[in-house]
Amino acid sequence: MSFLATKRQQAVGLVAAWVAATVEGADRLNPALLRALGRDESWDGWRLPLRGARGGDLHLLLDPEFPYSLPRFALGRRTDLLRAPHVETKGRLCLAGDGGRADTLDPVAVVAYSFGEALALIAEDEAGANREDYAIDFDAYWRRDVTDPLPLRTCLHAERRSRLVSAWHGQAFYFIAENARDARTWLTNRYGVDETRAFKNAALIWLDRLPEPEMYPDNAGRARRLIEASSYRGLPVFDRLMATMADRAAVVFMGATATGDVVQAGLLVEGPDWASTGTKAPKPNVSRGFRPGNAPPSILALRRRSHRVEVQRTDAWLGRMRAGEGAQLAGKRVAVLGCGSLGGGVAKLLLQSGVGRMTLIDPDTFAWVNVGRHELGSDSTERNKATALVERFRPMYPHARELRAEPTSWQVLLRRDPKALHDCDLILSLIGDWNAESALNDLQRSGTDEVRAAILYGWLEEQAGAAHALAIGPTGACLRCGFGPTGTIHVPATTWPRHAPVGCGGPTSIYGAVDLAPAQSLIASLAIDLLLGRASPPIRRAWLAPQPTLAQGGGCWHLRWIEHYGDPLQGGKLTATPWPKDAACSCALLPVTSFS
């Protein structure tokens, strides 16, 4: 027997002894009873009788990971509590929630404490307490009571108003967006082009007060009464849907919980349920008895049934971000110049963060030598980097409203279209080529209208011993202020006695994906701060690799860095350093125009 199996056997034995000594009338659950509760023979359990006039049982269940997991409890013979707060499907009690911690060295104490918590919850539910939890965790209680397995996937703005929206009816799910254009863009990004997709009206109803389970509608008539009682101006939107829908329509309820979180719940409304007769029966007319178009919406609703369904929010990831950041970034436009190992990873981080419009620009093809440190893999070799990245990112991040590839250099792009970068909120130059980036810097300072946005330059020092993110605006210090005329930085962070070999294609860059990750995060983080107005150019941040990384390649901290910014010692740190204007820099001689 393995170590963990032995530990479990010992823990279960201790719990069994505690149950026998503590709970009168308790019974061990046999395999058949465990299966009836949705568990297999790898579980152990007991039936613990509940005292009091209402009786019933409490099932104590230990999973295969016990004692390195929490005990579970489920109600038995208590149908009166199956819709009570903190009671989940099949009577399971929600006590500690996901991720609850246990004293894994004292299984009996954990079970005893959890048993007391379960009894306290049952007593509170019997007394009618905890009802405010329905509004705190509304979406979870709605999911508990769904009556149709078809989910609604939504991508909707959290606006506190009712309105008609657009729906695509698929076989596996319905997709709901603010309008047909947004729905088509998301579906095309995720699943590819399909010209046969059709879109229908759906209703989004803002509820000023979220309902408790006994008010959850089980037909369209009850849904209408709920809207009438709980939604300001939601009834005209619902009635319009009732008057114009065909066989089936979707309704999304949206509201704010007691903690301020915006939640969604779904409803499918359809025609009357006619039993199948095996023959072609006439289609029931929900408007019978009225002239066409004159049936009252209340009658149309009463004659239709509804099903509660789960809502799967395709923007749920925004809930893992700081409030409002995702919505702000969704409206930003970014251009990424250079889609190598650095640029590809930064682009991915920005899309994951919610940036809604992005153009990737790179003339080069992806080679086998970069498979180990690029977002692309071996299936993309010999393809243009920008094009391959866009094709990969579109289904991964369908929320992006515009994701475009330009398989050329930025110079060629601007010769073809001088306003190609005109509307960008931020330009990221991750080319790592002094000639191209000094040209971009001079163009920004030229006073023309081709580059209006701030430019965020990012580069790695040799062997990824340090990484730099430098934001330059139309005024103040420029890129050249910190470099010599041929692109040698004035104050490098590292020095390398043994340099990488240089061939006709330029120097070989020695670093792997792990070395690259902090640099990508550094640049993406500053990009987000710039887009959200939390930082402004000129600003430079640097990542200094752990000292053993330098030592492995024979590198060390550069004396000039130590003189200016102090000794990094063991490294492994992020630092912000000045980027002062150089009075002798040529930018002082160039015409400068400040663009708002």
Stretches with model-predicted labels:
Residues 1-57:
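Strand-helix-loop interaction patch of compact alpha/beta domains
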Residues 87-98, 103-144:
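Domain-level detector for trafficking modules
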Residues 363-399:
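Glycine-rich phosphate-binding loop and adjoining beta1-alpha1-beta2 segment
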Residues 143-297, 422-426, 430-596:
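Glycine-rich phosphate/adenylate-binding loop
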Residues 273-334:
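N-terminal charged helix/coil linker that caps or initiates catalytic domains
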Residues 34-99, 108-112:
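Compact alpha/beta protein-protein interaction domains typified by the UBC
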Residues 322-365:
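Glycine-rich adenosine-cofactor-binding loop
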Residues 389-425, 431-434:
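A structured beta-alpha segment of the ubiquitous adenosine-cofactor-binding alpha/beta core
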